[in-house]
Amino acid sequence: MPNNNIRTRFAPSPTGYMHVGNLRTALYTYLMAKHDDGTFILRIEDTDQGRYVEGAVDVIYNTLRETGLLWDEGPDIGGPVGPYVQSERMGMFKQYAEQLVAEGKAYYCFCTEERLEALHAEQRAHGEMTHYDGCCRDLPKEEVEKRLAAGEPYVIRQKIPREGVTGFDDMVYGHIEVNNSEMDDQILIKTDGMPTYNFANVVDDHLMGITHVIRGSEYLSSTPKYNLLYQAFGWNIPNYIHCPPVMKDAQNKLSKRNGDASYQDLVAKGYLTEAILNYICLLGWSPKGEYAEQEIFSLADLVRIWTPDGISKSPAIFDPLKLRAINAEYIRRLSPEEFLAKAEPWIDSAVHTPINKKLLCANLQPRCEVLGEIPEQLDFFDAMPEYDVSLYANKKQKTTPGSAKEALEALLPVLSDEALDFNDRDAVFDACKAKAEELGKKNGWLLYPLGIALSGKQRTPGGGTDLACMMGRETTLERVKAAIEKLNG
């Protein structure tokens, strides 16, 4: 493949949910390509069948589509260097490993599991790091051919140099060197003929012309082995960008196994996709220059301004409160129509009686931070909850249960007037305000009891006249009359 444009790849394994760290890798990989009009490739790495989860490939597709991280080449749309599913590429890996064997850069290893287990047990007993001892590294060619002909099981191992150092340059962590003597002769082809993850990665990245590899910093220690493979084949080494881990706190990495939220979990809780993506981008990356103080970025903004020099070396702590604040800001920026469309499923899950959703949303939007918290605010619409008349006492509004009864009785004829249009919130408010003026009272003296009578709660999405207009005349009158009876009781 020509390397005159940036080509990046997101290469997830279909093992379940898309956790936050994976989605961040996908986002950075996408931005690295798109910032310079490059090519973003999706490759599915499904060779580890033991970890394969049915339906997980669809999760990958759906998440990337929902977040707008659309790929230019991939399993479903094809491209010039397919197939883009690793299990469909199995035939090619062994020939590359055998090429290295022929050139003396790899070798057949016939050591059994039992021998390796005994070797590692002995090394541990002596306080050593477990490693392969090179038993088969220099077997005579005739012996190797004889054992292969006899059908003896084998793996193919990379012949790591015993002396010198291997260095590489990372765009985040700088230049890193490792003594070759500290590296193991890693397995390239397993006994079942399948490639190891590292080997398949290098071969696929080369054949697909990948110019920039973006991955977690946990792969830093493997990178010298990757480089030795590139050098063994005489291939161009890609640019490396290793990202710091996303942490739950100072000690623990964010992990689905520990019950931490995946992308799907956050959406299910009512976080907006755009807000999630915005926040995830800021986990370990900071904008520069004129954007240094800005926090809200659309995907188009990020494509324009994102560069890898903003990535930090330090672990990023996932802060739920920060995500919540960013989500709230995205909710504020929605048009009333957009908010209604996003909030409606949550409203419908909680309210099954006819209400004025447009007015409800006008009251919800300024207060809402997470859509999933809407239903708990609406539990009084379908049925009036039990409440104590002491709720009517409010020092600020100068109300008591006794004054509340007086206020509701004064409101009853106002709200019963057939000429009053409950679809006109301002008209209902003005009628109530006029009654308060007639009585020589402040608005709150009249309207605070109305809110309690309609909801049985002190905190509601809207004041008394808002609730009346949301519910309509019939429900409003029923509840006001019931409240007067309760106060008479």
Language model segments and positions:
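N-terminal Rossmann-like or analogous alpha/beta NTP/dinucleotide-binding catalytic cores
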Residues: 2-125, 222-235, 275
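Structural motif
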Residues: 18-20, 266-274, 313-319, 352-360, ...
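Glycine-rich phosphate/pyrophosphate-binding loops
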Residues: 34-46, 199-212, 233-247, 461-466, ...
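Conserved phosphate-binding loops in nucleotide/dinucleotide-binding enzymes
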Residues: 83-87, 110, 189-190, 208-219, ...
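Small-residue-rich helix-loop
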Residues: 336-439
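Charged substrate- and nucleic-acid-binding regions of tRNA-handling and nucleotidyl-transfer enzymes
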Residues: 426-488
